Amino acid sequence: MEKQHLQSHILREPERKKTKSFHGPQSDFKFPSTESLLKNEMDEYHLDNHHLLNDSIPRVNVTTANMHSGSAIDSDTNSQILSDYTSFSNPNSSNGYYSFANISDNTTSRNGPNSYQSYGLFSNDELQETEYRHTLDPEKISSNDTNHNNGYIHSTAGNDTQENNTETKVLGRGISNSISTANHSIPTIENISYRIESATSSLKSSKSVIQTKRLERPSINRVPTITRIGSIASYSSSSLNVGTSSLSLNRKRSNVSSLKRSGAIRCKGGLLYYFTTMGAKFRKQFHKMRMAIKRKLFGYQRSNSIHRSASIKSELNKKAKKSTSIKNRPVTSHLKRTQGYITNLQRSMSYKSLEPVLVPRFTDIMPNATSPMRKISNSQKAANYKKTASLRRTPSSIRRAASVFTSHNNSANATTENLANIVHATEEGPKSPELLHQQNNTIKGKISRSQGHSSLNTIIREPSIVVRNKVIPLSMKHYAIKEEDEEKLSSDEIKEENEENIDEYVIKTEQLEKQISNKHNITNLEPAEEIDNDDSSFDDVDFVSMDNDNEHLLASEIIKKNESEQLQKMLKQYLTHVIAQRIKLRLQLAKFQETGKIERESNSSHYDDKHLSTLVSLISEQESRNRRSQIFEKSRTYLSSETSSEDSIFNHATSDLALPFQYKNTSNDNVYSSDRLSLSIHTDFGESQGKHSTSVLSFHAQDVKRSLTLPISMKV
């Protein structure tokens, strides 16, 4: 037995300690199983769970008697043994012994009209028929009722002394004063007790208990007034008053507990809100109209209103002054930080960082300045207190910015005195070269790589971009991009280095212009034989060599450059040949026009027949080309307005200079027709010939059209 007991303790190592906090007669309550009940057959109604909650009454009486005699088992240990699911006496783990210390919850039904059906309503005969119908009916018994009926309980239950002793002892308790606790039912929060009996309980004991319950309910003669219900602790002391008024309260509660809806919910579409706002608007407008009428009718109120408005203005001025004084107060650093002010930055911004901003202003002020020093100080003050947009950077981006902007060393030493001296010197007379050099140095800046500075944060937080570890600013401050070692070098060495090392970010237009002007000095047009041989005017533009670190980029650029050079040479040869031939032809035609009309007779001109035949063949060829082009040009439409305006001007005057004149073979005589248009053509190549600078060409007006074969630099 001892081994078995020890084994059971070992098996029950994770003890359930929930029921240790509960004491009383219900601590050893357990759900009865079908094995512990009698062997007689029962119907389904008697086997219902509502009627099988309590153990047999004889067992309960024995346990209560033992408890009063002092030989009872400790209720805590008993409840632990009975409530343990791992006990050997329980083969089924899901439906074993159960600790039913406190079954009360808030889901029990409230005091209603059905909750007052007492056990005393049934007689002994009716009780046998409905033995279990009353077991779940709640009854509320106050302390006054129990004290009032103590004598009746003792007289009716005088048969069994043990029951009387237990009942009186239970009824003597202060808070849980209900008769049903004597039979080990479960008290709820509101002292409504459920007396649950088993089918195995004897009829005699149940009858004796039920006889004790025949109590007279207090009669309700009037509807009581609504009184405030106290807390649960004070509920038992005022249970009589609550018991008398609970029925009427429940009736009123059922009436009042219906769903209420406010007027705003009933009003669809927010009309209530609309009408209230409209009423407020009308009220304001009406008040304004009333005040306006009063001001017009009564003059004395006008003065009052003026006085009032003046007082309001003075108050507003006072408030504005107060707000400005509050703004000018020294605020803490965390408040400044919220306003975009970074601590200890504006103080560290000296003239070194402000000179690029200040110096251009001095040059503007100098000519017309009557009091330059005062203006300079104001501009400095404005620059000092100028708010700059703070650009927040992460530590990684600050580390990435390897180059930091600082000002020039000469400009670092320049103070307000130097700037004032420059201004005074400009007033007194012309600028000396030393002052000019000093002023230029103040404007210049530089990049110093990885150099610490007091105003580092101000410069880093300026809007800028980082390209190849170089900070390129996006602000209006003009910093000249120079390396830090360049100041020490002489001017000649700087020129040599600039020629060798051209910065990627600086494109110097002066060098490009010099190269282009050297290679594109187009000389005056010469005769066609010289133009054929001379190729100097059609050289291509050399590209500026860029210093790149990557070798593959250099190789690809060299290949592209060679290809472009070859292509340009081929185009140059072709264009020089074609253009030279056409210029030669125009020159010859111009010379023929200057000498006079072309005639077929060889004796009238000093030119040979060979020349005349070639000219006539050229003219006829141009005629046939023009006729072909006329067919296509009829269907063309000019889209752009500029070309259409140009064409409209040239259509009447200079349309096709490829056909300088038209030759007509008539039957009567081989001469030109009288319908002609004469134009004076000013050519650049004719300037060297003096008298041949201008020439008059006669064309047919209908055949004059614009041509793309005009020679270069010919002005029509």
Swiss-Prot record:
GO terms for cellular component: cellular bud neck septin collar; cellular bud neck split septin rings; nuclear inner membrane; plasma membrane. Signal peptide: none annotated. It is found in: Bud neck. One of its GO terms (biological process) is maintenance of protein location. Residues 370-382 have a biased composition (Polar residues). Residues 1-30, 370-394 are annotated as: Disordered. Residues 1-16 have a biased composition (Basic and acidic residues). Its main location: other. It comes from the Eukaryota. Belongs to the AIM44 family. This is Altered inheritance of mitochondria protein 44. The lineage of its organism: Eukaryota, Fungi, Dikarya, Ascomycota, Saccharomycotina.
